[in-house]
């Protein structure tokens, strides 16, 4: 992990419970910092990002589809719903837990989950939240999202956030994050940034020189300073053609990567309309890669 991954500044969570049972996180910013506010400490913390899933809400293959991608025997062409695992030697953080979460985690070592970051409330990003139950045997799990997503989680999964939990339900602590606040999960520093999923405000997340953004259609220019210095970008790219009202296409993702100035970019949240993985990768410019399920990258 880059030096920016560890901050010299300590960020404290406001642990005061609100009447809704959602713990709010007070915004905290380092003094004198730039847009991202990351430390230039010389400390290093190695980390790995594993793509647990790289597909859209339908996954790939798509039920009922007989296109060459959906019939492909190449494992790179099979995509579970989008999710990722960020790990250092001490800390494990999940980004989104869709309906394939159980299947995605079976090949992974069974170790404590220190935090769960949710980008937004859509089912393909939260439908597997009940499947974190086994990990709660290792300790409660802190869940982080924007305020609207926290409200949606309480509405959609009320039994997980009731005042009096019955035996066997996940033990989750829900935290509403303000945009651009800095939090520390173990030795991982996290900064949420605002993204527009069509008309829906959602979160992308920055971790030092890594940024993870999915389901984006647009981003306000005011958010760009919070991505300054990002070297590895993960961003959604639905397909090559036919504009979508709430997701960007591959050409838009490539242009966004150039605006950010990322050294390398991995495209995720991909449909079968991207085409066969090997052929589609050849169409991409240098430094832009199609992510695939199970891919691990050092960050």
Model features per residue range: what roles?
Residues 218-299:
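Cap/insert and terminal regions of metallo-dependent hydrolase folds
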